[in-house]
């Protein structure tokens, strides 16, 4: 059997990620019944940092708790603090239990919250909702 030819000398060159300094941004909190996702972006919508209850190791029904949402918000805020983020506008979406605790965690992480806006999509009688649970 013939051996495969060995490629000589070409290494992949990766472009180094430049650190942007952002002072104001937008925090998107998506709070569902099963999980809470916190994304911090600049004014144009480019993501600076993100975190979720599931990515922090919470599993199953623990992902939907207010404590998990608080931890997710703290983690995302600490990552964003490294880029110099100080002032944010918060946009909360969804019916989950982690809405208030995530917003509170942002202010304790040293980020000034300028405005809180609810952007939960409400249908004008669109799709049929899922059937009611029988427990």
UniProtKB/Swiss-Prot annotation:
SUPFAM superfamilies per UniProt: Translational machinery components (SSF53137)
Keywords carried by this UniProt record: Ribonucleoprotein, Ribosomal protein, RNA-binding, rRNA-binding
InterPro entries recorded: Ribosomal_uS11, Ribosomal_uS11_bac-type, Ribosomal_uS11_CS, Ribosomal_uS11_sf
Gene Ontology molecular function terms on file: rRNA binding; structural constituent of ribosome
GO biological process, alphabetically ordered: translation
GO cellular component: ribonucleoprotein complex; ribosome
Homology family: Belongs to the universal ribosomal protein uS11 family.
Function, in words: Located on the platform of the 30S subunit, it bridges several disparate RNA helices of the 16S rRNA. Forms part of the Shine-Dalgarno cleft in the 70S ribosome.
Subunit structure: Part of the 30S ribosomal subunit. Interacts with proteins S7 and S18. Binds to IF-3.
Name this protein carries in UniProt: Small ribosomal subunit protein uS11
């Amino acid at each position: 059997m013939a051996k495969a030819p060995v490629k000589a000398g070409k290494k992949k060159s990766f472009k180094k990620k430049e650190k942007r300094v952002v002072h104001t941004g937008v925090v998107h909190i998506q709070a569902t019944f099963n999980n809470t996702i916190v994304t911090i972006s600049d004014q144009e919508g480019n993501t600076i940092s993100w975190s979720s209850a599931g990515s922090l190791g919470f599993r199953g029904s623990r992902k939907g708790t207010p404590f998990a949402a608080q931890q997710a918000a703290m983690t995302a805020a600490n990552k964003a603090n490294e880029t110099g983020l100080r002032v944010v506008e918060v946009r909360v979406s969804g019916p989950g239990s982690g809405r208030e605790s995530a917003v509170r965690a942002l202010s304790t992480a040293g980020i000034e919250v300028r405005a809180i806006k609810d952007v939960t999509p409400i249908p004008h009688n669109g799709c049929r909702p899922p059937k009611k649970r029988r427990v």
